[in-house]
């Protein structure tokens, strides 16, 4: 089964994406016939260096061959996740949106599953009339954690099993996501634009 803390699958995935279909071709070879939300093929890549908020100049594409996306698609990751959940459910996978994993179940010092969060509690964590305790989900073979690099269960696992012993320290960056609605006259379908420079200072790459 799959547990998703968001109220709907893909609800926390606000990212657009330039998508290479290799893995999807292997996983679901007939994804086009199944109307996957992978429609807009990349037609052109532009590379821009931003000097400031008004001035930029183009970088020849041959200087950065890894930035070329011929044959790839421009997609919404959230929409793709929703579609993948439908394919999984059609195969008999139980998908539970709105059920975050809250605790780890251990058996013989191994991960055996998780317990979902309690439902029907107030802001202070006190049970309301609609209270329902979390459910135990026991895995048949394996439990896969996909909660991000600093999830609370991940931190518990790292500490318990010394997963960071002898490893380089993790590094983090802060990212901000926004969804913009752009007038059709102001964008070109199939265009991928890569930028660097402003607003970052010269001594900060990105």
Residue positions per predicted region:
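Residues forming the flavin
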Residues: 1-55, 60-206
